[in-house]
Amino acid sequence: MGVVAPNGHGLDVFAQALREGRSGIRHIPELAELNFACQVGGVPEGFDAIRQRYFDHEKLLSLNDNIGYASVAAVDAWTDAGFAVPEAEDDRVDWETGVIAGSGIGGMDTIARTVVPMVNAGNVRRMGSRIVEQVMNSGTSARIAGLLALGNQVTSNSSACSTGNEAVIEAVARIRLGLATRMLAGGSEGASPYIWAGFDAMRVICRKFNDRPEEASRPMSASAAGFVPGAGGAFLLLEELESALVRGARIYAEVLGGMVNCGGHRMGGTITAPNPEGVRRCVRGAVADAGISPREIDAINGHLTATYADPIEVKNWSAALERGPEDFPWINSTKSMVGHCLGAAGAIECVAVVLQLRGGFVHPSLNCGDLHPEIVPYERRIPHSAVACPDLKVVAKAGFGFGDVNSCLIFRKWEP
C-alpha cells in the first residue's frame, strides 16, 4: 500500500498518526485571501520535496498535485508489495498487472491556473506539449502505467466521494474474472481553491473553526458545521491469492467483497443527498458478496463527513446490519483527521482500514465529544481515543457520494 495523506506520507507515519489521533487539517492562507468562508483544509505537507525524491525533472513537468499524489502513492504501494520500479529503458511490459486510478475533479487546478488564462490571453502555443496529460481524466492511470510498465487494464474512474472505493471494487472484479493477476487501485485529488470553490458556494464545507483548524472536522458531532476539504492520494496493490502466496508476498488483508449502486434520485435521494434504501441495499450487497453474516463485522469506517447526513448514515448502518445500539460495531471517521479528500477519500480510508486490521486497533474519531442527539444511543461504540482490538478481524468501509452513488467494501485481516 502507499499513502500521501494530510497527516502523513508513508504507511508507518500514517499508522502512527491514526493511533495518536493526529490531525492534518491546517489554516490555508490562500483561502482567506480569496474570501472563502471555509479557510481550513487537509493538505499533505512538504509534497514538493517528496516528489522531487521520486521523479526526475522531465517527469515533474507533467505532474500536477493530483497526478503527483497518485504517482507517489502508487510507487510506494508497488515497492511495498516487493516489486522494483522498472527502468525507463526496459522494454518489458507487465501484462498481468493493471491500474484503476480515480479522482473526483481531476485537473481542474491546471485548467484554471494555466489553460484558461493562456487561452484568454491568446497564448495557446505557449502552453506547451504537456498540458493535455495533466488535465485529461485518465492522466493519473496513464502516468502510473508508464512508471511501472503496466499492460493490463489501465483506466480512471470518477464517482464523486465513492471514487476510491469503486476503484478497489472494480479491480477486485477484474481479478475475480481471471483477467488480471494484480491490480493497483486507488484515487487522488489535488489541493486547490478551484477544486473547493463550488463546495464553498454550496455552503457544505465548514465555515466555522477557521481559527481552530484541528477542531473543524467534526463527524457525528452536534456542532458539525460541514466537511473540511482535503487532498492526497492512496493505492492498494490487490493480487490473486495463489500468486501472492507463491511469491511469498506480505499480505495485509483480504478484500472479501464489495458493492456499488445508486439510489436513483428517488425516495429522498438527489444529486447531493442519498436515498436511504440505496445505502442499505449497498451495505447488504457488500455483506452478501463477502459471504459473511452482518454480525461478523467488528468495525465500520464510515463515510461520515460532518454534515446533516451523519445521523442518517449511522441509522442506515444499523438498519442494514440489523444491529442496534446494544450490539453495534465500532464506528469511526478518518475524515475527522484528514478532512474529506474527495476522489482520494475512499482510497486513503481503505488504507486506514487495513492498517487498523494489521495493528489490531480502532483509531479515534476526533471532535465528537458532543455527539449528535440521534447518534448518542451508539456512543459506547464511538472511540474518542485509540482502542486496542487484538481480535479485530472484519471491517466495513463505505463511501456515499454526490450523484446518490454508494459503495461498500468488506475487508478481513489476513490470517494464514
Please give the residue ranges for each predicted region.
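Condensing-enzyme catalytic core mediating Claisen C-C bond formation in acyl metabolism
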Residues: R22-H27, R212-A290, D298-A299, C368, ...
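ACP-dependent fatty acid/polyketide chain-elongation machinery
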Residues: M1-L60, A81, E242-E254, V351-L366, ...
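Acyl-CoA/ACP chain-elongation machinery
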Residues: P29, L179-A225, V260-A273, G302-P311, ...
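Active-site-proximal alpha-helical scaffold in enzymes
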Residues: A70-F83, N137-T140, A145-L148, V154-S188, ...
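A glycine- and small-residue-enriched flexible loop/hinge segment at structural boundaries
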Residues: E30-E87, A101, T110, N137-G151
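Active-site-proximal gating segment of KS-fold condensing enzymes and close homologs
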Residues: S103-T155, A201-C206, A309-G324
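Glycine-/small-residue-rich "gating" segment that lines the acyl/pantetheine channel
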Residues: A17, G122-G128, I169, A173, ...
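Phosphate/pyrophosphate-binding loops at sites that engage ATP/ADP/AMP, CoA/4′-phosphopantetheine
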Residues: A77-V93, A244-I251, C282-A299, L321-G324
